[in-house]
Curated annotation (Swiss-Prot):
Subunit-level organization: Heterohexadecamer of 8 large chains and 8 small chains; disulfide-linked. The disulfide link is formed within the large subunit homodimers.
Catalytic activity: 2 (2R)-3-phosphoglycerate + 2 H(+) = D-ribulose 1,5-bisphosphate + CO2 + H2O; D-ribulose 1,5-bisphosphate + O2 = 2-phosphoglycolate + (2R)-3-phosphoglycerate + 2 H(+)
Modified residues (N6,N6,N6-trimethyllysine): 14
Localization, UniProt: Plastid, Chloroplast
Function: RuBisCO catalyzes two reactions: the carboxylation of D-ribulose 1,5-bisphosphate, the primary event in carbon dioxide fixation, as well as the oxidative fragmentation of the pentose substrate in the photorespiration process. Both reactions occur simultaneously and in competition at the same active site.
Main localization (coarse): plastid
Name assigned to this protein: Ribulose bisphosphate carboxylase large chain
Note: The basic functional RuBisCO is composed of a large chain homodimer in a 'head-to-tail' conformation. In form I RuBisCO this homodimer is arranged in a barrel-like tetramer with the small subunits forming a tetrameric 'cap' on each end of the 'barrel'.
EC number in record: 4.1.1.39
UniProt PTM: The disulfide bond which can form in the large chain dimeric partners within the hexadecamer appears to be associated with oxidative stress and protein turnover.
Length: 475
């Protein structure tokens, strides 16, 4: 062997495989205000100590790999590595732990949810030493939050644009979700809006299909909005879904909505992707459009208790990426959502400062440093009998969206909208008078139905409809 290629054992570095916990498990570490903190629910393989499992998560989601490499000596691992700084057992679960990991801020590109998720929820979720892994929560430090624009407008600006105060906003998803022609679709929108709703909505899978191309839908919906505004004297909107196969096409659709004078567009942020979503959010702020966000595909990621990520993480990511509304579950309807857990991430969407509260699944205190808030949207299997509970649970800063609960009215769309508007106004008035919506809700609805035949008919149709199943994702 020539002298140039000969390797001396006394030189270089010590190769081989070493335990992650020797480098990445640091229980003595004091977290910094600039660290991004993560709480992982870790289920190790049998025989893998929890400290090793937590350290493996920290390593594989930051600077580590499966073996020692000589280029470790060319950087400062102490500066850049993730650290598992605490581990606690999960009550009531065997061999399951919460591992707390701190990441230095320099590991992440500024203003990029895409880069943040690529590291923290990347390859580590397929790591063989773990039976399952779930990201329960993230603490986004102010230093990183300030690199994001966030929601295009926020709650107060939206209320000012719409001139609507003191109550939740009312919406409706047009059904059937697929198959209507553009003209019939516009007719359905008009009937709902003239009946008293604030918004109607494209379903998440309405894009530009053969039965209804996007431009035709936009034109007929615009006609419906202008006609209903003229008749009611109220500002109306329809969530025009701009989601498309490319970012360029998405922006073209948003531009068309703006040119038609529409107040709001919509995006499917998980199927569309965070890069596309942030791009659209920036366009909406620059051009005065509100942005409604649908969370299609979220349950693929967040519904299983042991693997994936909790929706509160996706909600925080959305607030960073940008959106003025996001679907958040209903607690009382057909879609998954435990009350305290749902209220936990609803606060994370709306409020500026949220204290740690493990009873609601909030693992870290979160300071949004004045990043605009997001309106939670309650949608899915709700009807007039749910109105008192929804008003009490979500409060004024929310959107209550009744699809079948409007369009399923026996007298048609407009009477269905009237029934929902009357029920909402009755609940808000009763609450403002000091009545207990949780206890007196049914009585309040019955009283209002005495002078609203539309509400009385709705009450009769949906008096037996309930969705009572055990919640899968619990604390």
């Amino acid at each position: 062997m020539s002298p140039q290629t000969e390797t001396k054992t006394s030189a270089g570095f010590k190769a081989g495989v070493k335990d992650y916990r020797l480098t990445y498990y640091t229980p003595e570490y004091k977290t910094k205000d600039t660290d991004i903190l993560a709480a992982f629910r870790v289920t190790p393989q049998p025989g893998v100590p929890p400290e090793e499992a937590g350290a493996a998560v920290a390593a594989e989601s930051s600077t580590g790999t499966w073996t020692t490499v000589w280029t470790d000596g060319l950087t400062s691992l102490d500066r850049y590595k993730g650290r598992c700084y605490d581990i606690e057992p999960v009550a009531g679960e065997e061999n399951q732990f919460i591992a707390y990991v701190a990441y230095p801020l320099d590991l992440f590109e500024e203003g990029s949810v895409t880069n943040l998720f690529t590291s923290i929820v990347g390859n580590v979720f397929g790591f063989k030493a773990l039976r399952a892994l779930r990201l329960e929560d993230l603490r986004i430090p102010p230093a990183y939050t300030k690199t994001f624009q966030g929601p295009p407008h926020g709650i107060q600006v939206e209320r000012d644009k719409l001139n609507k105060y003191g109550r939740p906003l009312l919406g409706c998803t047009i059904k059937p979700k697929l198959g209507l022609s553009a003209k019939n679709y516009g007719r359905a929108v008009y009937e709902c809006l003239r009946g008293g709703l604030d918004f109607t909505k494209d379903d998440e899978n309405v894009n530009s299909q053969p039965f209804m191309r996007w431009r035709d839908r936009f034109l007929f919906v615009a006609e419906a909005i202008y006609k209903s505004q003229a008749e009611t004297g109220e500002i109306k909107g329809h969530y025009l879904n701009a989601t498309a196969g490319t970012c360029e096409e998405m922006l073209k659709r948003a531009q068309c909505a703006r040119e038609l004078g529409m107040p709001i567009v919509m995006h499917d942020y998980l199927t569309g992707g965070f890069t596309a979503n942030t791009t659209l959010a920036h366009y909406c702020r620059d051009n005065g459009l509100l942005l409604h966000i649908h969370r299609a595909m979220h349950a693929v990621l967040d519904r299983q208790k042991n693997h994936g990520m909790h929706f509160r993480v996706l909600a925080k990511a959305l607030r960073l990426s940008g959106g003025d509304h996001v679907h958040s579950g209903t607690v009382v309807g057909k879609l998954e959502g435990e009350r305290e857990v749902t209220l936990g991430f609803v606060d994370l969407l709306r409020d500026d400062y949220i204290e740690k509260d493990r009873s609601r699944g909030v693992y870290f205190t979160q300071d949004w440093v004045s990043l605009p808030g997001v309106l939670p949207v309650a949608s899915g299997g709700i009807h007039v009998w749910h109105m008192p509970a929804l008003t009490e649970i979500f409060g004024d800063d929310s959107v209550l969206q009744f699809g079948g609960g409007t369009l399923g009215h026996p007298w048609g769309n407009a009477p269905g909208a009237v029934a929902n508007r009357v029920a909402l106004e009755a609940c808000v008035q009763a609450r403002n008078e000091g009545r207990d919506l949780a206890r007196e809700g049914n009585e309040i609805i019955r009283e209002a139905a005495k002078w609203s035949p539309e509400l009385a008919a709705a009450c009769e149709v949906w008096k037996e409809i309930k969705f009572e199943f055990e919640t899968i994702d619990t604390l």
